[in-house]
Structure formats: structure tokens, C-alpha cells
Amino acid sequence: MKKTLILTTALVSFGFAANADVTVMSWGGAYGAAQTEGHVKPWAAATGNAAVMVDADNPAQPIKAMVEAGNVTVDVASVEYADAIRLCDEGILEPIDAASLPAGADGTAAADDFFPGAVTECGVSTDIWANVYAYDTTKFPADAAPKTAADFFDLAKVPGKRGLRKGAKAVLEFALMADGVAPADVYATLSTPEGLDRAFAKLDTIKKDVVWWEAGAQAPQLLADGEVAMTTAYNGRIFAAAIGEGKPFQIVWDGQLYENEMYVVPKGAPNKDLAMDFIKYATSTEGLRAQAAHISYGPPRKSANVEPIIYAGDGKTVMGPNLPTAPENMTNSLLTSSDFWVDHDSELNERFQAWLAQ
């Protein structure tokens, strides 16, 4: 029933795109806008094909429902790395011909130009993004502002409500890092009953003060409305609010969890060949730089990071220091393990939901 409802919603919501040559599904908000400005519009202009962007809270869910129902209306989807691996294993996605991806602008072969892990059997990275936390600078004196992952969980030192994404992924890892587990040891720790108990025990320390969010747009809105003192968020959402809208928000990079976002093609996409062409265009050196000019997610190609990228919103902000991949932002960071979440997503989310209900 759940899959049927998801599919029905998807078909109703996205039916208006039926006449488009390529339909791209993404996450909406600042991220969807960045992909629209950096990829969808330029590709359409360059090729003469029609293209449209549609939104979903998590594109992996509706595209899986569409494929299983045999009624696919989306050609390209933007999904999290673990979902790209899982859906590929389940036969939901078309394979990607990695050899067909264009060389970098400097002539470097794609296989050598992409960062390790950025190209998988069924997906190509469009950016590297991060789960971070942020606070409103007007709420804290400079000498009392939160600075570490541990501060997020320290209600005595930094009082106030906390915003957290409602799910196990990125929350359990963040809790362990805040509790002193080194990034290199997080997944080994989380793979043990004792480590899992430790993560939930850390979450227990702030549970009564948490405001849960699900859609990415909710996190910066919680800050703007004063509902929380600080919140976890997608770094691009905070950048868009702070730099694009002038909100007094500050990111704390300590304890960030970063990962690749992937473009994939659902099995049975109505315009498969055009979808593949779109992905080649979007993940070229120029395509990746074009997206990064609109949102603070790092390009996953070496050639796309050679020259400074300037924020299109104001024509002056240099994006480098605002990216998850900036060296100064990666001091205490963790690359999200897709293998871990492919293997443990269901069981850990079941326990997470049970914990929420307690």
C-alpha cells in the first residue's frame, strides 16, 4: 500500500512533465535550483531538447515505486550515494557506461579526473555535500558560540532546543563523534551492540529538547523562526540562507558527514539516451562548476576545482572556503559509508523509530 501511495503521488505531482524530453527529479529548494540553473537550463539550451525539473522529498522512493509499477515518468534522478548503490543492486537503475563520460577540461580521462568512488555502476556524482550543524549568530556572544560536535549535545554549556533530521543516518554517526569517537572508528563502533547503545545514549541526553525535521527546507526555517538554538542541516541550505538571503547563520564544520550525491537513470526511463547525454553534460568539468556556482557543494572532479568558483548569487563570494571539501573544514569529518547503510539501513531505522516512540 505504501508503495502504491508513493507512486500515485508521484504520477499526480509530476504528470505535467510528460511532454518534456527529459524530466529530472531532485530535492527542491536551493539544491534543485542549483541543478536547474547549472544543468537543466544550460543542457536544454545547448542541445535544443526540452527539460524540466520536478521535486521530491527523497527521489529514491518515487523512482523505485515507478519502476516496480512499470510506469516510469522520470528520466534522471538525484539520489544519495547509498541509495544509488542499493537501487542498482535491486535492479531499479540503468547501468552507466563510465567509459563514455567526457574527459576533464584539461584532457584528463574521466576515470582519473573523478574523485575515488564518484562513479559507480549505476551513478555519477554531481557534487559532494555535507550534513553539518548551524546556529544563529545573533543568539550567542562570540565567546559562547558553539564550536564543536560535542557542543551540540551540551545543553548546560549551550542551552536551547536542537533541530535534528528524523532518521538514523548521519544522526547516529554525529552522536558518536560528539561522544569522542574518532571518525576512523565510527562505523566499526556503530557495528557493535555496545557502540549502537552508546550512540542512542548520547541522543538520550538531548532527546527532550529536539525538534525533528524531515525536508531539507525545514532546518534553516527552524533557525529563522527561532524554534531552535541550533540545527543539523545540509550545508548548501545554510549557505543559501546565509549568503543568498543574508540570514545570520554560521556553520560548524566540526563533525561534518560528507558524501557524494548521484545522478542515476531509472530502469525503463522514457528517454534513456537523452538521460545519459544529460548526465554526461552535467558531470563534465564545466557542468560541475556551473552547479557549484549556485550552491556550496564541492565538484567531484579534480579539473573542476583548479580555478576559483564564484557564487552566481552575488558575483563575488569565493565558494572554496564554503565547501565541505575545503581542507580547513575537514579536520574532524567523516565520509558517510554507503556500504554500512546499504547493509544496515532498515534495522537501524527500525530501532531509531522504536527509540523515538519511547
Give the positions of each predicted feature.
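Conserved C-terminal helix/tail region of periplasmic/extracytoplasmic solute-binding proteins
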Residues: P327-Q358
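A ligand-binding cleft/hinge motif common to bilobed small-molecule-binding domains
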Residues: A84-R86, M230-P248
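Early extracytoplasmic/lumenal segment of secretory-pathway proteins
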Residues: D21-R86
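Paired acidic/hydrophobic, glycine-rich loop segments that form the ligand-binding mouth/hinge
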Residues: N71-S78, W212-W213, A229-Y234, Q250
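Mature extracytoplasmic/periplasmic domains
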Residues: E261, P266-N332
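Extracytoplasmic ligand-binding site segments that recognize negatively charged/polar headgroups
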Residues: G29-A34, V79-A84, C88-Q218
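Gram-negative bacterial Sec-dependent N-terminal signal peptides
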Residues: M1-N19
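Periplasmic-binding protein-like
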Residues: L196-T205, I243-A269
